[in-house]
């Protein structure tokens, strides 16, 4: 039976690498795979999924208007892989859940669970509600512990505790942190206090 799977982690855990490896595994066996990534993430170019290891592959893009239904699948699609799935809208997650169960094509969504303030992305919250299976990928904090939080940095490398939820960036803009380091950091303490108020 096909299902919707949410593979999540903090920044820099290797989610895109795992997606590209999964795509390779299907292709190596002679199977067709469909890849999607968020149109707003153009760090590697529009419609390109690139890992920090340097491997990349072209992909279709999704935006807020994309409809995920049977029309997006080729006749012989063996699996649908979606990168940056935190940017999906809840209605799109519902469409993907329906598609997985009516098309018999497994759908694997890779993304962040929460933003730089520790708040859920709408797409991730919907995936945590509807996905049939979950896989957490381990990221590592600078202290060596498991990182589950994301911290945003400004151009000077200082921690940011306010701003828009979505700001595309890589290692120069975000770091993964364990909860202890996230909250002990001065900006994290300010955010925790403002969230509690």
Swiss-Prot record:
Residues reported in the UniProt entry to bind ATP: 9-16, 83-86
Highest rank taxon of the organism: Bacteria
Native source species: Albidiferax ferrireducens (strain ATCC BAA-621 / DSM 15236 / T118)
Catalysis performed (reactions): thymidine + ATP = dTMP + ADP + H(+)
Gene Ontology biological process terms in this record: DNA biosynthetic process; thymidine metabolic process
Protein family: Belongs to the thymidine kinase family.
Subunit structure: Homotetramer.
Main location group: cytoplasm
Keywords: ATP-binding, Cytoplasm, DNA synthesis, Kinase, Metal-binding, Nucleotide-binding, Plasmid, Transferase, Zinc
Molecular function (Gene Ontology), one example: zinc ion binding
Protein name: Thymidine kinase
């Amino acid at each position: 039976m096909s299902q919707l799977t949410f593979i999540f982690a903090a920044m820099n855990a290797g989610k895109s690498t795992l997606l590209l490896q999964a795509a390779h595994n299907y292709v190596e066996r002679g199977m067709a795979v469909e890849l999607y990534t968020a149109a707003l993430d153009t760090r590697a170019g529009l419609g390109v999924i690139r890992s920090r290891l340097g491997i990349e592959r072209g992909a279709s893009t999704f935006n807020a208007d994309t409809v995920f239904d049977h029309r997006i699948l080729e006749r012989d699609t063996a699996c649908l892989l979606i990168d940056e799935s935190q940017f999906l809208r809840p209605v799109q997650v519902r469409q993907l859940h329906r598609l997985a169960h009516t098309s018999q094509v497994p759908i694997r969504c890779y993304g962040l669970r929460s933003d730089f303030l520790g708040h859920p992305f709408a797409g991730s919250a919907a995936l945590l509600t509807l996905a049939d299976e979950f896989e957490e990928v381990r990221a590592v904090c600078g202290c060596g512990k498991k990182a589950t939080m994301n911290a945003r940095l400004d151009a000077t490398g200082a921690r940011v505790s306010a701003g828009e939820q979505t700001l595309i960036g890589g290692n120069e803009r975000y770091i993964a942190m364990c909860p202890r380091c996230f909250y002990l950091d001065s900006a994290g303490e300010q955010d925790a206090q403002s969230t509690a108020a």
